[in-house]
């Protein structure tokens, strides 16, 4: 626990991405769980930190003024910058570029469309949402081809695996795992990492 760095969140994929990044980077933090069903994310005090009323939000009180980050992917970059070499190769070169390329594949081609499908479902546009969901599953299936090494971007766990893990978790019951042996092997390996277990435990529903 570290009160200098606080992470506000809930049991969501976005929060999990941020928490895993901090855990993998070895950055001590204090989790601050918000009950979304009780609409704690709309409390006036929290809205001063995150006017959109969403999670996660990271506060680094070690900076003057305190640094506030509201985007999970920005928190991943924050963690990578504070702990060079932990979430991506520290030195410029092909290995680092591959990590960034795979990371953004999951952010832009998989996670972003899945969010669009979620909002379409909420708006009652189920047919349109289903089309996008199928596209997400196709892209996750395509990721099988990435796994020529242990992880999504090589032999080292990286930010690419963080973005991949949370979205694969969300779609795990809709994937044909028998057709995805490498993705299945990768998922089991990543899910068993202590950082994943700690990040999940930090924001489980209470």
Predicted feature locations:
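Residues at alpha-helix termini
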Residues: 25, 49, 174-175, 194
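GST-like fold's C-terminal all-alpha helical module
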Residues: 79, 105-192
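Short, solvent-exposed turn/loop segments enriched in Gly/Ser/Thr/Pro and often Arg
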Residues: 35, 159, 203-204
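Long hydrophobic alpha-helical segments typical of transmembrane helices together
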Residues: 186-206
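Residue-level recognition of oxygen-bearing side chains
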Residues: 74, 182, 195
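GST-like domain detector, emphasizing the conserved glutathione-binding G-site
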Residues: 1-130
């Amino acid at each position: 626990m570290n009160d200098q760095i606080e992470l506000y969140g809930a049991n969501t994929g976005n929060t999990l991405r941020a928490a895993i990044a901090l855990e993998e980077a070895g950055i001590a933090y204090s989790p601050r769980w918000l009950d979304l069903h009780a609409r704690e994310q709309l409390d006036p005090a929290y809205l001063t930190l995150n006017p959109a009323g969403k999670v996660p939000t990271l506060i680094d009180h070690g900076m003057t003024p305190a640094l506030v980050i509201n985007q999970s992917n920005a928190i991943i970059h924050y963690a990578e910058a504070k702990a060079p070499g932990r979430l991506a190769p520290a030195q410029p070169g092909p290995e680092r570029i591959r990590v960034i390329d795979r990371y953004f594949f999951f952010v832009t081609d998989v996670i972003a469309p899945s969010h669009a499908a979620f909002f379409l479902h909420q708006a009652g546009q189920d047919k349109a949402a289903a089309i996008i969901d199928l596209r997400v599953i196709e892209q996750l299936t395509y990721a099988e081809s990435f796994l020529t090494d242990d992880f999504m971007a090589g032999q080292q766990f990286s930010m690419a695996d963080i973005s991949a893990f949370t979205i694969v978790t969300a779609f795990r019951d809709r994937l044909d795992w028998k057709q995805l042996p490498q993705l299945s092997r990768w998922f089991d390996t990543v899910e068993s990492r202590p950082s994943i277990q700690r990040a999940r435990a930090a924001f489980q529903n209470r």
